[in-house]
Amino acid sequence: MEQAGLYRAKVEKYKKALTGFNRLFEHDMALFDPVITDAIMNGQLQKFEYCSELMWKAIRLLIRQRNKISPKSPRDAVKEFFNCGYINSSQYETMIQILDDRNKLSHVYNEDVFTEVYSRIGEFKVVMNDVLTILEKVSID
């Protein structure tokens, strides 16, 4: 597949995952039984992990193809995304927190970490949607 097609496919995959993630926030959690609420919250964080992975990989491909920079890690990809002017410093800081929190969630289950990360999920959702908008506007043709 040509690079532009590969990039569009990665962005589309990210968009689809992010749409599913966003849908999990459309319901009033107070209406559900605590067991159901817990299951939904776990699903939200699982989709958060998946979306954050797709996000940085799409960013890495963009940076490689358009800016001729080869980030070695998720943090490097986000740093170069910022250095190339795609995002502002506030978005950069939030994206670094997204990566840190994704790592916390994927390595151990700890209820305190779960609660801490969940408290930031609204802010993360906003920035992840901002990144999608940026990725959709950029072409690597």
Predicted regions and their residues:
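Solvent-exposed interaction patches of small proteins and small membrane subunits
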Residues: M1-D141
